[in-house]
Amino acid sequence: MKLHFSFFIWVALIVCSTVMASDKIDEAIDLTQQSFVPVFIRMSDQVIARAGEYEKLCREHSGNPRAQNRKDVIAQLRCKADEAWQKIEKTANALVQNGGIRSIRQFWIVNGFSCLAKPTAIRKFAKRADISFIYLDRFARPSKKPLPMSGNAMTAMKEVLSTWMKKSTRFSGSLRIPWNVREIGAQSVWNEENATGKGIKVAVIDTGIISTPALIHALAKNSEEELNGLDDDGNGLIDDLFGYDFIANNGYILDSAKTTSHGSSCVGIIAGRSSKSGLQTAIAPDSKIMLLKGGFNLHSLEYLMSNGADIVSMSFMIVNRDLGQIRGLFRNAFEHLSLGGVLAVGGAGNYGPKSRRAMPVGKQIGLPKDIPCVLAIAGVDRSRVQLPFSSEGPCYWEGVRFFSDYSKSNSLSKPDLTAFPSGYPVWNISGSHKIRPDWREVEKDKGASLVVGPAGNSFSGPHAAGVAALMLSANPELNPWETSEILRETASDMGSVGTDYKFGAGLIDALAAVRAAKKRN
């Protein structure tokens, strides 16, 4: 009898262990095939492990200056990743040797690693207590080694460096300022509060920029790197002088597009210097820009966090695609990013109920703007009327592993704030005004033009980034969650009283936000 009972317990434990292991594997992974699958293996030891912990840690860290939080959080993240890798490295290397996995890439913004893995290896990893989940990596790209730029690209970048080294037009409040900059309150901030974004670095993940002085003079330069085809600062990247392209894996940060330059328009709204005629598009005209290419690349988040970015402005977003559990991985990363001192912002999207690309309620604002700590910015015209394309909330997180906290009965209120997405000059490729009959060129400058006409909430997001830069130049130690709170508290209410699904907390008020920022300890 004892023998039969022991056997029953043994079988039950095996079954239980198998069930628990399979529960760690993303349901989107097909384990019936024997081919390699792109996966991200999330370790159990995280600074933020599940929903609710970010808010708790924000409260605990609120008494610390942002610089201290950045230092401490990066150290924690790196330490956890290093310790976890030491424990699993032997197993991972053995699986590489026997053909079970390949193309390993380690990360610390979320403690884990990506690889191509066969089902047998996936099942083996799932049995380990130090692994919490195995995601289908829906954003996996072939791994490329850092390589020097092509000859033409190097020549173009040397021209950028040459222009950057020349003295730029000094910022002056007497320059011609577009209506959107004035009406968001930025010009009043410069004149009345003497806050211009000085000392603040904004990372922009986009398409890169046109080679034109007004944008080049806004760039932040990596003082430890030379433009020589080498990795001078020892960070594993070649020629990351003004940022990095994490898709091509090189330092070429110019826009390769031939018709329109999305990145140039966004950078110009945040930090564009004066044109040759004195037209200045920037909200934070003394802030500096770090250029990055490669949305949904965790290494780009690690790079900007460890290289001193205070804010990250993003235009990329995914809607109308089932991302499954991978949403939780990116929420994890952005919560770590925020805890470590970087405010993430971006446009809420152009999928509103009256848009030609309209999406259903609850699906108009996608990853990463649907993440609670990422500010999603909606759009109104100069008359404060909602633009037809502007995406509306709410957002849901029900069923997302570790982060299933916002259901349809308890939804996440989005967008967060509102700004202006069109009707003012933006930097673009010369000749781009010919794309649409209602676009017009207002000025030509070296290598580029200022064009009125391009529209989209991708241009609302940079307004929030620029205003946040003004706030941080007035009070550099504000933490991201404190900056977000002030922006919401000082916004001009629109639509229904209080926060709503069309305008969030309302239209951003730069002057009120900067004054409130100065009063925070």
Residue ranges and their predicted role:
Residues S22-T155:
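Inhibitory N-terminal propeptides of secreted protease zymogens
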Residues G197-K198, R273-S277, M290-V374, S383-R384, ...:
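Substrate-binding/access-modulating region of protease and related hydrolase catalytic domains
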Residues K127-K201, S211-L215, Q386-G393:
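Protease zymogen maturation seam
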